[in-house]
Amino acid sequence: MSNRVFEVLQQMLKLRKDRSVAQSKRVQAEYERVRNFNLQVESYAKEYETQWVKAAQQGDTVLNLQTQANFGLNLRATAKSQEPEVQALKSQSREALDKALQDAQRLKTLQSFLAKRKQQRQRQFEKHEDKALEDVLQARQNTKQ
């Protein structure tokens, strides 16, 4: 194949790698955002449970205790309802990272191939030059005799 074809292929692989890396970063950021929000909601639920226990120990009204308990349960339910989304984003993040790594490896492989090809061509060129120089020297030696 011509060098131009390999250059275009290399550019395409670079673009593909850049896109997949950017996508991986976006998905990872979204996963972190949703996971942190979910952890924050769970933290609030624990805080309300602690407050509920303190209020119960202090003899707060039943209505107030029920309100605090219900709010804590609602927070837990919210956190639990988001768990599938968190897991889906975690999976998407892993897949996007794997794709980015594969694309980077493809690019690295092509670059390695092109470097070896360039070295091989350089060696052939040098070998050809050496042969031409030998021929010139041999011709000079033959003309002197």
Question: How would you name each of these model-derived features?
Answer:
Residues 1-145:
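Charge-rich amphipathic alpha-helical interaction elements
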